């Protein structure tokens, strides 16, 4: 799952 807050 991509964390769009960090980009990771």
From Swiss-Prot:
Alphabetical keyword list: Amidation, Flight, Hormone, Neuropeptide, Pyrrolidone carboxylic acid, Secreted
Gene Ontology terms: cellular component: extracellular region
InterPro entries: Adipokinetic_hormone_CS
Cystine crosslinks: none
Sequence intervals crossing the membrane: none
Residues annotated with Tryptophan amide modification: 8
GO MF annotation list: hormone activity
Protein name, per record: Adipokinetic hormone G
Modified sites of kind Pyrrolidone carboxylic acid: 1
Family named by the database record: Belongs to the AKH/HRTH/RPCH family.
Naturally occurring in which organism (per UniProt): Gryllus bimaculatus (Two-spotted cricket)
Location(s), subcellular: Secreted
GO terms classed as biological process: flight behavior; neuropeptide signaling pathway
Function: This hormone, released from cells in the corpora cardiaca, causes release of diglycerides from the fat body and stimulation of muscles to use these diglycerides as an energy source during energy-demanding processes.
């Amino acid at each position: 799952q991509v964390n769009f807050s960090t980009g990771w």
